[in-house]
Each structure stands twice: as structure tokens, then as C-alpha cells.
Amino acid sequence: MRVIIADSPEAVARMGAEQCIRLLQDKPAAVLGLATGSTPIALYAHLIQRRQQGEVSFHQVRTFNLDEYIGIAPQHPQSYRSFMQKQLFDHIDVLPENTHIPNGMGDPIAESRAYEDKIHSAGGIDLQILGLGRNGHIGFNEPTSSLSSRTRAKTLTQETIRDNSRFFSADEEQPHLAITMGIGTILDARKIMLLAAGAAKADAVKAMVEGPISAMHPASALQMHPSALVIVDTDAASKLELIDYYRWVQSETLRVQGAYL
């Protein structure tokens, strides 16, 4: 696992976008694993800008999102399909038929199996983008999720439900279930990039990077991946014991390669 400490949330997003663009320049038909939530929004804004400047194309790209609420139709304003259309897809040249998000209105077991098959048929995911929950969840893999789990239905924790309640009005019934890629599915990606910003994520970042690998902290499974990149801002990195070492590695990488990444 490689840790990059950025000066600000904006720098986290910019560095993350640069990784995506380098991949697409090397492999225009890459398969991207995408995430929702507040952290990726700034990343997607950078990708949109770079697309508008003609630096990158998504015309051959295929995408697979991590998760979707069960019981919410794609056209619902709080569905992750709606989120992705608003925050990314409507502003780039990706083909609609190449964007994949679990169907929250289908049979969860059948949909989960079909989603795994679609990923396999696409040749697997080249770069999986992740955010990080305050309790260490990635996707909707809550604490105690199996580290070898595949795409399936999951019951959300009360903490996750509270965290997401701000997106739903008082008269809306908030989903308590979701279809999510499993941790094993995520670890199958050839590269993984996790972004986190803010002091509220500091405990989760420390447990992910420096804690034991444990189902109680699902993101800690990334320690087992041969090509996992963690990009965090100074607040999210504030509780890392080896923060000086991570900064030293950054400076040495810059000295030798001429760039952090």
C-alpha cells in the first residue's frame, strides 16, 4: 500500500484525477470501478474539466459502480444512477451502454450474480476508485463483512444510515439495504485508488493503513493488494504514526521520478 499525503481536499481530487487520466491515455478502453459519496465529486469535476479541454476521452471506457440502494429506482433523485449521471456521465463522452450500476429494483441475488458476470465479461476492473466510510467501510461492505465476499445484498449499519440521511428529505423512506461489490470483488481490480479527506476520516485512515487486517475494518483488506494507492489530505492523515515516513517516501519519489505519482 502506498500512501500519498496531499495538502488539501482539492489536491486529493486533482492527484486522483491525474491517475485516472494517465490510465486512459495508456489504455483508452480501460474498465473503471467508480464510487459515489462526497469525496469523488471533486475528482469527477477534474475529469470533466480535462475532458472539456480535450485531454482525455471516455468514449471506449466501461464503468462499474460499487453499489446501489435496494428499492430505489434508477430515476429516483437519490439513486446512485442519478448521482453518477449528474456528477459525471452527463458531462463526458462515455457511452450510456458502457456504464453499469447494480439494479436496486431487481432480485438482489440474481442481480448480484449478473453483476459479477458483467465485470468478468469486461475483463475485470483496471482501476477501482474508492471512498472511505468513517467506520472503515468500502462500498457498502460494513464492519464484519467477509474479506473474500462477492457482490451481494448488505444491510447498512445505523451509522451509515445516519451519515446518508442528509441526502433524504424527512418524508422519504431511507433505504436500509444495498447491493454492493464485495471486498473480494474489489480486491480483484488490477489497481485500487482510495481517496479520503477531512479529520472525520482520520481514525478510519489510521486503521486502514496501520492497523491489523480485520473484518471489523473492511478497508484494511487493501493492505493485501499489490497495487493499492491511498491519497489523503493532511487532516485525514493526522493520526498516522508513520506520517513522517510517508512524507519521506513522497519526497524521494519526487526526487527520483520527478513526480509524486
UniProtKB/Swiss-Prot annotation:
Enzyme category, top tier: hydrolase
Keyword annotations from UniProtKB, A to Z: Carbohydrate metabolism, Hydrolase
An example Gene Ontology molecular-function term: glucosamine-6-phosphate deaminase activity
GO BP: carbohydrate metabolic process; glucosamine catabolic process; N-acetylglucosamine catabolic process; N-acetylneuraminate catabolic process
UniProt keyword annotation of Thylakoid present: no
Active site: 67 (proton acceptor), 135 (for ring-opening step), 137 (proton acceptor), 142 (for ring-opening step)
InterPro entries registered for this protein in UniProt: Glc/Gal-6P_isomerase, Glucosamine6P_isomerase, Glucosamine6P_isomerase_CS, NagB/RpiA_transferase-like
Catalyses which reaction(s): alpha-D-glucosamine 6-phosphate + H2O = beta-D-fructose 6-phosphate + NH4(+)
Gene Ontology CC terms: cytoplasm
Function: Catalyzes the reversible isomerization-deamination of glucosamine 6-phosphate (GlcN6P) to form fructose 6-phosphate (Fru6P) and ammonium ion.
Assembly with partners or alone: Homohexamer.
PANTHER family named among the record's database cross-references: GLUCOSAMINE-6-PHOSPHATE ISOMERASE
Name assigned to this protein: Glucosamine-6-phosphate deaminase
